[in-house]
Curated annotation (Swiss-Prot):
Listed GO biological process terms: intracellular protein transmembrane transport; protein secretion; protein targeting
Entry's family note: Belongs to the SecE/SEC61-gamma family.
Name of protein: Protein translocase subunit SecE
GO cellular component: plasma membrane
Membrane topology: Single-pass membrane protein
Record-annotated membrane-spanning stretches: 38-58
Single GO MF annotation: protein transmembrane transporter activity
Keywords associated with the record: Cell membrane, Membrane, Protein transport, Translocation, Transmembrane, Transmembrane helix, Transport
Organism per entry: Acidianus ambivalens
Main location: membrane
Length: 58
């Protein structure tokens, strides 16, 4: 399948994904949001600590 055929097929694939996908309920969305925020905070804290340590080493 060449690139042009793949590009022409994209809207059909997107439509299929939208019809199969379902909206999460409130509890599931809340859980995903909490997990995402906790992971973002952890990564931010880790990056800050690494930057802080490297600032004192260099």
């Amino acid at each position: 399948m060449n690139l042009l055929e793949r590009i022409k097929k994209l809207p059909e694939d997107w439509k299929r994904i939208i019809t199969v996908a379902k909206k999460p309920d409130k509890d599931t969305f809340s859980m995903y949001l909490k997990v995402t925020l906790i992971v973002m905070a952890f990564v931010g804290l880790l990056a800050y600590l690494i930057q802080l340590v490297l600032a004192f080493i260099i």
